[in-house]
Swiss-Prot record:
It is an enzyme of class 1 (oxidoreductase). Residues 113-247 form the Fatty acid hydroxylase domain. InterPro entries: Fatty_acid_hydroxylase, Sterol_Desaturase_Related. It comes from Arabidopsis thaliana. Requires a membrane-bound cytochrome b5 as an obligatory electron carrier from NAD(P)H to SMO. Its cofactor is Fe cation. This is Methylsterol monooxygenase 2-2. Keywords: Endoplasmic reticulum, Iron, Lipid biosynthesis, Lipid metabolism, Membrane, Monooxygenase, Oxidoreductase, Steroid biosynthesis, Steroid metabolism, Sterol biosynthesis, Sterol metabolism, Transmembrane, Transmembrane helix. It comes from the Eukaryota.
Length: 266
């Protein structure tokens, strides 16, 4: 496996510059992972497949789904890509590299774990601030246009929010100056996590059924169903911040009622 990764990386660094890999390569990787993981949930919703695992019974119209995709492409090319280009000198100054030797798996794992921890902390407070009255009305309400989320709505947001909450994702790598392969792995994991959290389905194989403190779709779907500034469930990947500060009480109360059979799923 190591030799396969090294040979593949050797091809990339031989044929492309550091700038091309870090900027264009990162953008193409993000787009590929995001749309390949998110589009199937549109198909599931339209066809009604696996509907017994759907958290909400409501479906989005094809027009609403199309609007989301169109807006995403606009923002990805007009906000995300320029941001990647502009941040390249910063990451280089902080020590990011694409050259050999590749980092060990221990180093990669330690950095990824650090990124998750710091991203959860920064995202929680940033997200909670966005639910203040003025910011929710003028910025964050765009993301909440979809009360019944599907995978691609994970990145449907106001440009100001993209920049604001995007800081939570890049602050960890900016602090450590990782190898580009570590940054790519972090980006892939983060994209898959946020798509899953917005997918609208809670499957028997969902990570939240096996991984302690992992939020997942059921946790975040509750946040979207309540169109209020105090909806709670502000966490990103892991939910310990909501538990510590008591902002998941409504969700936990609802979950207890469901488990006791006192109410039906809506």
């Amino acid at each position: 496996m190591a030799s396969f990764v090294e040979s593949g990386w050797q091809y990339l660094v031989t044929h492309f510059s550091d700038f091309q890999l870090a900027c264009i390569g990162s953008f193409l990787l993000h787009e590929s992972v995001f749309f390949l993981s998110g589009l199937p949930f549109i198909f599931l919703e339209r066809q009604g497949f696996l509907s017994k695992y759907k958290i909400q019974t409501k479906n989005n119209t094809p027009a609403a789904q199309g609007k989301c995709i169109t807006r995403l492409l606009l923002y990805h090319f007009s906000v995300n890509l320029p941001l990647m280009l502009a941040s390249y000198p910063v990451f280089r100054a902080m020590g990011m590299r694409s050259s050999f030797p590749l980092p060990s798996w221990k180093e990669v794992s330690a950095q990824i774990l650090f990124y998750f921890i710091i991203e959860d902390f920064v995202f929680y407070w940033g997200h909670r601030i966005l639910h203040s009255k003025w910011l929710y009305k003028n910025v964050h309400s765009v993301h909440h246009e979809y009360a019944t989320p599907f995978g691609l709505t994970s990145e449907y947001a106001h440009p100001a929010e993209i920049l604001f909450l995007g800081f939570a994702t890049i602050v960890g790598p900016a602090l450590t100056g990782p190898h580009l392969i570590t940054l790519w792995l972090w980006m892939v994991l983060r994209v898959l996590e946020t798509v899953e959290a917005h997918c609208g389905y809670h499957f028997p194989w969902s990570l939240s059924n096996f991984l302690p403190l992992y939020g997942g779709a059921d946790f975040h779907d509750y946040h979207h169903r309540l169109l209020y500034t105090k909806s709670g469930n502000y966490s990103s990947t892991f939910v310990y911040m909501d538990w510590i500060f008591g902002t998941d009480k409504g969700y936990r109360r609802l979950k207890t009622l469901k488990e006791n059979g006192d109410m039906k799923q809506t």
